[in-house]
Amino acid sequence: MTKALFFDIDGTLVSFETHRIPSSTIEALEAAHAKGLKIFIATGRPKAIINNLSELQDRNLIDGYITMNGAYCFVGEQVIYKSAIPQGEVKAMAAFCEKKGVPCIFVEEHHISVCQPDDMVKKIFYDFLHVNVLPTVSFEEAISNEIIQMTPFITEEEEKEIRPSIPTCEIGRWYPSFADITAKGDTKQKGIDEIIRYFGIKLEETMAFGDGGNDITMLRHAAIGVAMGQAKENVKAAADYVTAPIDEDGISKAMKHFGII
């Protein structure tokens, strides 16, 4: 019996087209929560830029958060798991981005900054994702504190180039223009394990929903993994079930299919 639902945000709960949560999704989550199921967020976003869930938060529908792809998990005000990237690999990524002349976002526990912001940062983070403008700092300043997640604006080819210099890091993508980098082992799969340990829920009682490359680990790990209909084929292949696209009531349809609501 399913007791815990894990949802990615962008492309799963929140439409890339409307930048809103479909009304059918809100109604489905309300119905599930009313039946006693726990609802958790599992996102690549840091806490500070989760700015699009007010329709769920205002209804008290969220029981906990997996953020930064599993590197920072919290329930209410209690941090139940956090993990920093080894400083040597932070320095390697900073040097790589500085040399390439590409932006990189560095995320600390309570602070986010960006180095070398360009039009792509503005287009994606500020205009498209509606993130507040981040402070611009030098690479030296950005890496002076403990870093939990790095988001370099690198291509998949550049990702292959830097990979040997960051051997103990995880690399995930939920948008083609950048990668999210965390410490080794910090994935949404890890986040699920930390959340269910805290709540005393069994893995066989979990269901996860996602659409991006950074969702693959949790779709495979949860008892039931549901891929959104607009997801790429490698994401769909990792899932147990493929539902309709987000803008065609995919969440609601999947939850009805499995008898959750």
Residue ranges and their predicted role:
Residues 23-120:
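Active-site phosphate-binding/coordination module
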Residues 96, 100-209, 213-218, 230:
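Conserved acidic, metal-coordinating active-site core of Asp-based
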Residues 1-7, 30, 34, 201:
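Non-catalytic pre-domain segments flanking phosphatase-related domains
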Residues 3-18:
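Asp-based phosphoryl-transfer active-site loop
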Residues 60-61, 69, 165-168, 221-222, ...:
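Short, structured coil segments at secondary-structure junctions
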Residues 36-40, 61-62, 146-150, 204-206, ...:
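Short active-site oxyanion
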Residues 2-4, 22, 181-261:
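Mg2+-dependent phosphoryl-transfer enzymes with acidic/Ser/Thr/Gly-rich catalytic loops
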Residues 57-60, 81-84, 121-125, 190, ...:
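Short, hinge-like loop/turn segments at secondary-structure boundaries
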